[in-house]
Amino acid sequence: MNYLVIDTSSRCLYVGIRRGKEVLEDFSQDCSLQHSQVLISKIDALVKESGCPLAEMDYFACCAGPGSFTGIRIGLTTVRAFGQIFQKPVLTVNSLWLKAYNVEAAGVAVPLIGAVRGKFYCGAYLNGKELEKPRMVESAELEIFLKDIEQKSGLPAYVIYEGGPDGIRRLEPPKKPFYIEACDEL
């Protein structure tokens, strides 16, 4: 199976092409939310480098949020267009689950995505399983959310966020995301 995966839901753009379990080509870069200026040229370059044309993709996948509304629209529009043109299915993935999937934690993974006005999108995951549905929390509520997760699970909660509030236990996201590997779980 061949598939194209993109993530435009955050500052970092990710594009990957995979054949079965083999990553043929991938690209990840902080594009400062300028995905529309970079996405198509990066897809074109990766298709050429991989030797796997879009017409040979078995499906197209992208992150459907939460995250940057405009970024999500760019990603969804791109994969839906490819899906219609090549008559192939389109898959979407929750951005929070994907961030948690890619990090091994000795407890509960709590990915955060910055929202507006000091708020965060967050969820809680243990070994790829959702413990708490994605939600938006105020910055002041975050510590309460983490303590609640720890109390319910009996395990420490680790925040996955670049930077993040001080004084909380956290893991840095991988420097090079392995988002494409989560496709096996879909």
What is each residue range found by the language model?
Residues L46-S50, I85, V103:
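Stable alpha-helical structural segments in soluble proteins, enriched in small hydrophobic residues
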Residues M1-A64:
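N-terminal beta-alpha supersecondary unit
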Residues V38, R73-I74, L171-E172:
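Generic recognition of short, well-ordered alpha-helical segments
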Residues Y14, T70, I168-R169:
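Glycine/Thr-rich phosphate-binding loops of Rossmann-like dinucleotide-binding domains
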Residues E22, P89-L186:
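Surface "functional belts" at beta-alpha junctions
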Residues Y59-V90:
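DPxDG-like acidic metal-binding loop motif
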Residues V38-S41, T77, A81, L98:
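Short amphipathic alpha-helical face segments that pack within enzyme cores
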